[in-house]
Every structure is written in C-alpha cells, then in structure tokens.
Amino acid sequence: EKIRDCINSVLWADEIIVFDSGSTDRTVELAKKYTDKVYVTDWPGYGPQKQRALEKAVKDWVLSIDADEQVTPELRVEIDTCLEDDPKAIAFRIPWAVHIFGKRLDFGRSGRAPLRLFKREGARFSDAQVHEKIILPSGKIGKLEGRLLHFSHRNMLQALEKFIQYSWLWAQQRHEKGEKTGIANALLHSCWEFFNIYVFRLGFLDGRRGLLMAILFWQYTFNKYASLWSLNIPVKK
C-alpha cells in the first residue's frame, strides 16, 4: 500500500533491497520498477526476514526501514552529513514521527528512537518473530535529530488486527523460551506502558490521538502477558 512512497524516499541510496513474503497486492511489481534486488520468500518472522535482507547487502552502511516508513529530505541530508562527520560511530538511532489515522504524533510513541542506521560489518538481527533487535559489536551509537515517518495505523480495524497478531507472536516466542507470567503481572506491565507513553513521554500533548495511542498500547501490553499466561495453563483432558 505504501511501498512506492517508501522507496521514493530512499532513492538516493547506493543500493535498495526489498524482501516480500508473498504479498497479494502489487508490492513486488512496484518494487521492481526501482530496483532489481527484489526477493520473494516465505515468512520466517521479522528478525529472520530482516537478516536475510542484511545478508544481501554489500555496502558499508545499512538503513533498515519497513514499508510503512519514509525518510524525509531533512533526514536524508543529516544521514549524509553524520556518516562523514562522525567516523567513530557504528550506528545511529532515528526518532520516529508516528502518524495515526491521518495525523502526526510528536510525543508519546514518537518519543522513541529505534536503531535503524548501522555499519553492516559485524551486525546481525536477532531471530525474534516480532520486535526484533539489531545486534552490534561494541562501539559508539549516535542519535539523529531528523524524524523517520512511520504510518503505523490507517484505521482502527488495522490497528487492532496488528496488535492482536503481535501480542500472540510475542507470547509464543516467550513461551518457547520457558517464560511464565500471571494476570497481575499483565496488569502491572500494561499500566506502566500507559503512563510511560501518556505521561513520561508527554503523549497527552498529542490530544485525543495521543490518549488513544496510550490506551491501545495499554491493551496491547496486557494482551501480550495475558496470552503468555494462557499458554502456560495446563490443558485438561
């Protein structure tokens, strides 16, 4: 749905690599208009899929973005500058500018700055099914000022479906590692997530959408831990 805008925002890159996991829209067709490095594979999870893409890269630096994200012209200039001016850095965090239901949020979830720009050598993605991490060798990690646009939720149905999928994947992943939790713990974590987004990260300054985002993540966090709890309930025959 947003692949064209995503790729257009990074056309200045020396190489563009696109991985598709069997989408049924025109994603592959559109992507091939911009790069010949388009790969269609199965879906092993977010971490393994991004590791596959990383292994195809040949340039020194990698910018990892999802199809619902875009690089602003200002961020592009800053990226070019920082790679020249800070030779000791091995990676950079980039602040998000989350868009929800057609409006940008400047606080709350937009207060996060995920690690997205990094040196390829020695880097790898974790094997997490969801909420994957970039694992780096020791070194300096900087933070940019420009924002990475993130069009995360186009409507309420899409947001709820995404949160349900992510919470279940997270629970399965933790269950496989032998982790356990309880309903009280689910409530504690979800309340903390709400206050973290709405109060500590100033989500209340984003108005009604800021409140809605905090509530959605309260629900999402509760569902994660409640799902993990449910997976550990003995099945009675």
Language model features by range: what are they?
Residues 9, 20-29, 66:
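A conserved acidic beta->alpha catalytic loop
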Residues 1-12:
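Short, well-formed alpha-helical segments that are part of the catalytic scaffolds
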Residues 48-54, 61, 65, 72-237:
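Catalytic-site signature of metal-activated, phosphate-bearing donor transferases
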Residues 28-58:
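Conserved donor nucleotide-binding strand/loop of the catalytic core
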Residues 23, 44-45, 69:
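Alpha/beta-hydrolase active-site loop signature
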Residues 15-16, 141:
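Hydrophobic/aromatic residues located in beta-strands of well-ordered beta-sheets
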Residues 12, 33-34, 113, 137:
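Short, structured coil segments at secondary-structure junctions
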